């Protein structure tokens, strides 16, 4: 999860987030190289006394500054499109969870079980236990199995919301009357925190998301005791 004074992205805990981190570094490297080239060119122009006074056209230069940007943009677009298709690809999910946004809480339904659903509200500051995080803890955590393909169905019952868990690379809009889906697969156990990422009213900041990823056997035990 995030920590104070953090400058970079959160540690990746899913294959999608790992790909996003690689793409971030790839794009940032290209931006750094272009910025360095531009600054170098500007410094040369400011320090040199040479001037082109008789040049009417420079077809070679015009060709190069047309081809090079196209190559650079292609090198950025192709990995981006690959990740975009990866986020939409869902292959034989073993579990389907439906998340509904409300003002201002989330409700979850485990559609593979007959009676396993609950509402998830933010824990008030006065009710926090030692070690719990202010504005991020909930009364009912969403327990999920790790290393398992999970399909998330996301919608809303009132206004626009957005279901986001940064360390898993997840952010999907919750739109009234529309059912969006995304895939989730965590590579390690633990607690993963997120929040509503769409301004949805006065208590928008009080819609935390807490996913508790556990081994499959522990999840089966929890689901049996809960349902």
Curated annotation (Swiss-Prot):
SUPFAM superfamilies from the UniProt entry: Cupredoxins, Cytochrome c oxidase subunit II-like, transmembrane region
Q: How does it assemble?
A: Component of the cytochrome c oxidase (complex IV, CIV), a multisubunit enzyme composed of 14 subunits. The complex is composed of a catalytic core of 3 subunits MT-CO1, MT-CO2 and MT-CO3, encoded in the mitochondrial DNA, and 11 supernumerary subunits COX4I, COX5A, COX5B, COX6A, COX6B, COX6C, COX7A, COX7B, COX7C, COX8 and NDUFA4, which are encoded in the nuclear genome.
Transmembrane segments in this chain: where?
15-45, 60-87
Q: Where on this chain does Cu cation A1 bind? A: 161, 196, 200, 207
- Which cofactors does it use? Cu cation
Q: Which Gene Ontology terms cover its molecular function?
A: copper ion binding; cytochrome-c oxidase activity
Classification via InterPro entries: CcO_II (IPR045187), CcO_II-like_C (IPR002429), CcO_II_C (IPR034210), Copper_CuA (IPR001505), Cupredoxin (IPR008972), Cyt_c_oxidase_su2 (IPR014222), Cyt_c_oxidase_su2_TM_dom (IPR011759), Cyt_c_oxidase_su2_TM_sf (IPR036257)
Mitochondrial intermembrane side, ranges? 1-14, 88-227
What chemistry does it catalyse, as a reaction equation? 4 Fe(II)-[cytochrome c] + O2 + 8 H(+)(in) = 4 Fe(III)-[cytochrome c] + 2 H2O + 4 H(+)(out)
User: What species is this protein from?
Assistant: Galeopterus variegatus (Malayan flying lemur)
UniProt GO BP: ATP synthesis coupled electron transport
PROSITE patterns, per the entry = COX2, COX2_CUA, COX2_TM
Question: What is this enzyme's class at the first EC digit?
Answer: translocase
Q: Which family is this protein grouped under?
A: Belongs to the cytochrome c oxidase subunit 2 family.
NCBIfam families in UniProt: CoxB
**What is the protein named?**
Cytochrome c oxidase subunit 2
EC number annotated for this UniProt entry: 7.1.1.9
Q: Any note on cofactor binding?
A: Binds a dinuclear copper A center per subunit.
**Gene3D superfamilies linked to this entry:** 1.10.287.90, Cupredoxins - blue copper proteins (2.60.40.420)
């Amino acid at each position: 999860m995030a920590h104070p004074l953090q400058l970079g992205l959160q540690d990746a805990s899913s294959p999608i987030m790992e790909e996003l981190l690689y793409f971030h570094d790839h794009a940032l490297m290209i931006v750094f190289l272009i910025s360095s080239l531009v600054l170098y060119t500007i410094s040369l122009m400011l320090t040199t006394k040479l001037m082109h006074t008789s040049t009417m056209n420079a077809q070679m230069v015009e060709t190069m500054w047309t081809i090079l940007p196209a190559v650079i943009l292609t090198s950025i677009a192709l990995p981006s499109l690959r990740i975009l298709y990866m986020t939409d690809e869902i292959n034989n999910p073993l579990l389907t969870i439906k998340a509904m946004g409300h003002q201002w809480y989330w409700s979850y339904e485990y559609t593979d079980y007959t009676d396993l659903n609950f509402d998830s509200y933010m824990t008030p500051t006065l009710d926090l236990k030692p070690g719990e995080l202010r504005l991020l803890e909930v009364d009912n955590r969403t327990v999920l199995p790790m290393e398992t393909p999970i399909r998330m169905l996301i919608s809303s019952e009132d206004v626009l919301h957005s279901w986001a868990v940064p360390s898993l690379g997840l952010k999907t809009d919750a739109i009234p009357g529309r059912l969006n889906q995304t895939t989730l697969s965590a590579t390690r156990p633990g607690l993963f925190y997120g929040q509503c990422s769409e301004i949805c009213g006065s208590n928008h900041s009080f819609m935390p998301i807490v996913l508790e990823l556990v081994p499959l056997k522990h999840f089966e035990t929890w689901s049996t005791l809960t349902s």
